[in-house]
């Protein structure tokens, strides 16, 4: 989700794109529009209170936020300064034609509470002291609208928890172990298989081209990741090269890829999702409504959706990326630390001017 990180140096990565000159003045100044307060309810159960401090009503996007009912990452969990492994799902959402059900309306001054259990998506059975925090950017539409127009940057309070490991072990896990005997990467629908194979080939070409371009175009690295530090550029290129390799490894790669959702985690507005703990990527029905490659600057397509999802897979490159923000406006508001660990920063960086020289692979 738009989330958390407390670790000062999340060293890695990123995404390729070399143009789409949208004016920086296009970004609303919404640094203090949301107040997020975390409270402990009982052992591993947490309450988030979201307050609209803006001077107008908003429609907040629910996906990958506190409003998401799915097993998405709502807070970062740390023990002794080290992040705890997340065992839920990472989703890529549409940034266009979203249904009204994808939003939560909030009036000026209104507070909305949401409760969740952090033990449902992380193993906390060791017990003891933990710290949790959430930060990122929540996309929004204006009141009664569904067109994303900006993003509210937020950072919650840091909350310390004393967790009983035995009690944490009794919490039902949101994602059950997968049957390793099931060949989930077999796609029996020929049309979907053809689309997926094309997307993988296009992703391989696109990510490889973008990795090379990262070295040649520090101005664009600055635009998407807010740094031209050589170490960061190398990290960006390394992740993209890894994604290119994985996209081209249809038989012996580190991930499994399902062309249909057998786990009922798709819903309107979701393009695909990844289970990082299983290195499994799953396409949703709306994935197949996307073009193979878009000519629209910062648009979405099948190739960059594959690229986005592989950024979530630890088997491709570690540390795997989170979903701190979605869309160009949102990712432009992230700090360098969060941008380098944000999957959509990768897919947007990949969707740039150099695409004009990229031929769609059609066979």
Swiss-Prot record:
- Cystine pairs: 187-259, 266-284
- Signal peptide positions are 1-19
Q: Where is the active site?
A: 309
Can the keyword Hydrolase be found in this entry's annotation?
Answer: yes
Q: Identify which cofactors the protein needs according to its UniProt entry.
A: Zn(2+)
- Its predominant location is secreted
Tell me the Gene Ontology biological-process terms attached to this UniProt entry. Answer: proteolysis
Q: Give the UniProt subcellular location, in the record's own words.
A: Secreted
Gene Ontology CC terms: extracellular region
PANTHER family per the UniProt record, alphabetical: NEUTRAL PROTEASE 2-RELATED, PTHR37016
State the name under which the record lists this protein.
Answer: Neutral protease 2 homolog MEP7
Q: What is the lineage of its organism?
A: Eukaryota, Fungi, Dikarya, Ascomycota, Pezizomycotina
């Amino acid at each position: 989700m738009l989330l958390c990180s407390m670790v000062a140096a999340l060293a890695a990565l990123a995404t390729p794109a070399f143009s789409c000159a949208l004016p920086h003045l296009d970004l609303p100044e919404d640094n203090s529009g949301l107040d997020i307060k975390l409270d402990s309810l009982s052992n591993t159960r947490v309450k988030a209170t979201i307050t609209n401090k803006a001077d107008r009503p908003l429609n907040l996007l629910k996906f990958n936020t506190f409003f998401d009912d799915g097993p998405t990452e709502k807070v970062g969990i740390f023990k002794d300064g080290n992040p705890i492994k997340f065992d839920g799902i990472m989703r890529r959402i549409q940034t266009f034609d979203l249904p009204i059900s994808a939003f939560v309306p909030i009036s000026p001054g209104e507070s909305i509470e949401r409760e969740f259990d952090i033990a449902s998506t992380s193993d906390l059975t060791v017990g003891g002291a933990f710290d949790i925090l959430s930060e990122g950017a929540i996309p929004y539409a204006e009141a009664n609208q569904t067109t994303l127009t900006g993003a509210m940057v937020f950072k919650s309070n840091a909350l310390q928890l004393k967790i009983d490991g035995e009690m944490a072990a009794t919490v039902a896990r949101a994602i059950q172990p997968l049957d390793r005997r099931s060949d989930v990467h077999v796609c029996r629908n020929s049309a979907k298989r053809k689309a997926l194979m094309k997307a993988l080939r296009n992703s391989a070409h696109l990510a490889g081209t973008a990795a090379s371009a990262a070295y040649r175009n520090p101005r664009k690295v600055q635009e998407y990741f807010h740094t031209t530090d050589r170490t960061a550029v190398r990290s960006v290129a390394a992740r993209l090269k890894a994604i290119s390799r994985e996209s081209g490894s249809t038989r012996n790669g580190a991930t499994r890829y399902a062309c249909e959702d057998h786990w009922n985690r798709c819903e309107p507005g979701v393009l695909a999702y990844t289970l990082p703990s299983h290195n499994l990527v799953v396409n949703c029905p709306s994935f197949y409504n996307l073009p193979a490659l878009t000519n629209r600057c910062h648009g979405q397509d099948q190739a960059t959706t594959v690229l986005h999802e592989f950024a979530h897979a630890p088997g491709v490159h570690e540390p795997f990326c989170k979903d701190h923000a979605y869309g160009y406006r949102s990712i432009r508001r992230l700090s360098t630390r969060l941008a380098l660990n944000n999957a959509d920063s990768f897919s947007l960086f990949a969707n740039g001017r150099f695409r004009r020289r990229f031929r769609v692979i059609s066979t």
